[in-house]
């Protein structure tokens, strides 16, 4: 293996590892950009679906209105999706500017900041999804032992729309986890580069 980043195959054909690395980095940047805008779009969709979810039901001549604020888990879900959408929009714009200028990340402080932000978003969205999913199970099936009735039997439209919002949040969660993995790679790659440069000096 040459120190110039050029390897020689068994057939004596030069292989440019540096070029392959740049291609991989470019693809990862495109994937990161797509994922961030997916989070932004689906997070906004989930927040709107749940935030506008209402249904009025008349029970014994008394009108009762179901809305997302009646369940704290759904309030958390709306807030988490809104924050994730806004954060991902800002990070997506940063990715676009970086790709247009052709420059890469990075200083280590900025890499740490992005990594930390992505980790927080992943944990927050996963927690919101878990809380909303548990509440939806109680609403759908009830809890006979605690005498909790099945509310979805009365508010079917409300539950269906909330379910659509939770489904969108599932894709948001998966995307935030993937983005956090990419940002972790981008961060620790900087330390790997420095280690390689130090070894080259010796």
Where do the protein language model's features map onto the residues?
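Juxtamembrane loop segments immediately following a transmembrane helix
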Residues: 60-64, 131-165, 197-202
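Helix-boundary and loop/linker segments of multi-pass membrane transporters
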Residues: 21-23, 66-70, 104, 154, ...
């Amino acid at each position: 293996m040459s120190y110039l980043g050029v390897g020689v195959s068994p057939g004596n054909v030069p292989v440019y590892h540096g070029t392959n690395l740049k291609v991989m980095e470019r693809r990862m940047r495109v994937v990161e950009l797509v994922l961030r805008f997916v989070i932004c779009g689906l997070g906004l969709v989930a927040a709107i679906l749940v935030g506008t979810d209402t249904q009025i039901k008349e029970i014994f001549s008394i009108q009762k209105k179901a809305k997302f604020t009646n369940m704290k888990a759904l309030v958390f879900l709306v807030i988490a999706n809104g924050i994730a959408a806004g954060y991902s929009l800002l990070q997506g714009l940063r990715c676009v500017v970086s790709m247009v200028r052709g420059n890469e990340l990075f200083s280590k402080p900025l890499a740490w900041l992005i990594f930390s932000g992505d980790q927080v978003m992943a944990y927050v969205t996963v927690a919101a999804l878990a809380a909303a999913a548990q509440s939806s199970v109680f609403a759908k099936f009830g809890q006979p032992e605690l005498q909790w009735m099945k509310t979805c039997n009365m508010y079917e439209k409300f539950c269906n729309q909330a379910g659509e919002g939770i489904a969108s949040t599932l894709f948001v969660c998966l995307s935030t986890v993937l983005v956090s993995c990419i940002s972790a790679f981008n961060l620790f790659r900087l330390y790997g580069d420095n280690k390689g440069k130090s070894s080259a000096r010796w």
